[in-house]
Curated annotation (Swiss-Prot):
Mg(2+) 2 binds at D217, E389, E393. This is Ketol-acid reductoisomerase (NADP(+)). InterPro entries: 6-PGluconate_DH-like_C_sf, 6PGD_dom2, KARI, KARI_C, KARI_N, NAD(P)-bd_dom_sf. The gene is ilvC. Mg(2+) 1 binds at D217, E221.
Length: 491
């Protein structure tokens, strides 16, 4: 099979990369109605599979789970989760032929096997759903022409999809219809109903394309969302310990620092995050972020180039075929780092202390968010998509580090995200080594001293922060998420 994106001509590639429209709330007036009375069969009962299914059932849909015979016979975790939550569970052969919508929520590397198993069983005119388009775009999976192919991609881990729904809200969501598979022209109606059934319409839905979702998702998770947090954690911890900081305190400052810092980012963008600093610290964080952007821009651009060309995907799929040798090696190496094995700090760190003593971490967040956004937009991805795949998801990933350090982050994210994270972090750590030797007192682990600032310089820095395009689009999109709950509780 050929990479689907690479079969398109340049005009088609640009059109699909640039497809992004914020949908009006009244477009979801029918809610999940289009799927009421129809049979939805979910394949896979992981975090997305279970939690989307619970939401869909609570929205009045008929939901069941198709699992492999071995998973049922051996009563594996997927079978237990589905049955314990009262869902009908059956084999592919038992459930797929009756399904009006088959939703494939298995891991990326399983998609080809799953789709090849379910396609022959699907009835004529049924629909196939994804929450990530890797199988269609990068693998180039060919789907029967009578089947409608749609995507509903919540911009959140599965657990958050459920929690926000239970609060009467939802999470921002991308929806799309595969242009090669919409024989009856009902793809958008199916996608809208599915998105509404998960609660996504209450937080904002972007009509996108499979191509735009995949390319932006890969870029975000590899760079700012996971790769930058991993590289930053390792670099900052080692620097603190090298300068004599208690390893336990250093570990806590970093583990919970990302979460606390990005909570401000979530509520008010880069502007609010920077406003939590004293004026001298803000000027220093800005200067550090500009240095970081200059150093890291080529690395961000390389990742975007490799994602657009398909180089990243082909390399990762080669590792799949080699029993994940690279992935598992990198995972093991991460588990052996000093940060992951540092003792726990039993004392308290106040919320403001995370900001005052984490100026470099704030600079890393600012630089990473802006670079990811700028690089995606330069590649033809629309600003709204770039925002969701950079700034919006960052607090959610930071929250996983707060739970169990980098181990938890890499467990929660997909194998695709984890592989890309290691690629980026393994390049970023040596790239930033020299930069780390030039830090000043007050950049990390100690507060910036003094209060004196130049008014004109502060004015110009404030203007530069607030006039960045990600701040403009972020203010608009956050207006649809006024019900967001507070994730972080400073440790």
């Amino acid at each position: 099979m050929a990479n689907y994106f690479n079969t398109l001509n340049l005009r088609q590639q640009l059109a699909q990369l640039g497809k992004c429209r914020f949908m009006a709330r009244d477009e979801f007036a029918d809610g999940a109605g289009y799927l009421k009375g129809k049979k939805v069969v979910i394949v896979g009962c992981g975090a997305q599979g279970l939690n989307q299914g619970l939401n869909m059932r609570d929205s009045g849909l008929d939901v069941s789970y198709a699992l492999r015979k071995e998973a049922i016979a051996e009563k594996r975790a997927s079978w237990r989760k589905a049955t314990e939550n009262g869902f009908q569970v059956g084999t592919y052969e038992e459930l797929i032929p009756q399904a009006d919508l088959v939703v494939n929520l298995t891991p990326d590397k399983q998609h080809s096997d799953v789709v090849r198993a379910v396609q022959p069983l699907m009835k004529d005119g049924a629909a196939l759903g994804y929450s990530h388009g890797f199988n269609i775009v990068e693998v180039g999976e060919q789907i029967r022409k009578d089947i409608t192919v749609v995507m509903v991609a919540p911009k959140c881990p599965g657990t958050e999809v459920r929690e926000e729904y239970k609060r009467g809200f939802g999470v921002p969501t991308l929806i799309a219809v595969h242009p090669e598979n919409d024989p009856k022209g009902e793809g958008m109606a199916i996608a809208k109903a599915w998105a509404a059934a998960t609660g996504g319409h209450r937080a904002g839905v972007l009509e996108s394309s499979f191509v735009a979702e995949v390319k932006s998702d890969l870029m975000g998770e590899q760079t700012i969302l996971c790769g930058m947090l991993q590289a930053g954690s390792l670099l900052c911890f080692d620097k603190l310990v090298e300068e004599g900081t208690d390893p336990a305190y250093a570990e806590k400052l970093i583990q919970f620092g990302w979460e606390t810092i990005t909570e401000a980012l979530k509520q008010g963008g880069i502007t609010l995050m920077m406003d939590r600093l004293s004026n001298p610290a803000k000027l220093r964080a800005y200067a550090l972020s500009e240095q970081l952007k200059t150093i890291m821009a080529p690395l961000f651009q390389k990742h975007m180039d490799d994602i657009i060309s398909g180089e990243f995907s082909s390399g990762m799929m080669a590792d799949w075929a080699n029993d994940d040798k690279k992935l598992l090696t990198w995972r093991e190496e991460t588990g052996k780092t000093a940060f992951e094995n540092a003792p726990q700090y039993e004392g308290k760190i106040s919320e403001q202390e995370y900001f005052d003593k984490g100026v470099l971490m704030i600079a890393m967040v600012k630089a990473g968010v802006e670079l990811a956004f700028e690089t995606m937009v330069a590649a033809g991805i629309i600003e709204e998509s770039a925002y969701y795949e950079s700034l919006h998801e960052l607090p959610l990933i930071a929250n996983t580090i707060a739970r169990k350090r980098l181990y938890e982050m890499n467990v929660v994210i997909s194998d695709t995200a984890e592989y890309g994270n290691y690629l980026f972090a393994n390049a970023a750590v040596p790239l930033l080594k020299e930069f780390m030797t030039k830090l000043q007192p007050g950049d990390l682990g100690k507060a910036v001293e003094g209060t004196a600032v130049d008014n004109a310089q502060l004015r110009d820095v404030n203007d530069a922060i607030r006039s960045h395009e990600i701040e403009k689009v972020g203010q608009k999109l956050r207006g649809y998420m006024t019900d967001m709950k507070r994730i972080a509780v400073a440790g």
